[in-house]
C-alpha cells in the first residue's frame, strides 16, 4: 500500500490528527489536517536541537519523552495529545504529526514510523 493510502487510513482511524512531510530544509511536501498557529518548521528545529527541553506549539507545551536524530516522541501532560516524528528512511525528510491523546505516544510513534518508511523520493 502507498504512503498516501496508509496515511489516509491513519487519519480515518483517528491515529493522526495533523501531519506534515518535511524536507530537511523544512519545505512542506504533504500535509493533512490543520492546526491554527502551529508551525511544523518550529517542531523540526526543536527536534534537531540536542537539548531535551519541552516544545511549545500554538501555546501548548509538549514534554519530550524520547528524542534521537531519527525519532521524536513528546506529550502534553494536560491530555492535549502528542507531537511525534520519524525520519524517513527512503526520502531525505521527516514525517511530523500531532496525534490525539486517545492514542498512546509509543503507539503513535509506531504508526508514524511505519508511514515514514513508505515515503519514497
UniProtKB/Swiss-Prot annotation:
The keyword Secreted does not apply. GO terms for cellular component: cytoplasm; cytoskeleton. The keyword Cytoplasm applies. GO terms for molecular function: actin binding. It is found in: Cytoplasm, Cytoskeleton. Keywords: Actin-binding, Cytoplasm, Cytoskeleton. Its main location: cytoplasm. It comes from the Archaea. Binds to actin and affects the structure of the cytoskeleton. At high concentrations inhibits spontaneous rabbit actin nucleation. This strongly suggests this archaea has a profilin-regulated actin system, and actin-type genes can be identified in this organism. Belongs to the Asgard profilin family. This is Heimdall profilin. It comes from Heimdallarchaeota archaeon (strain LC_2).
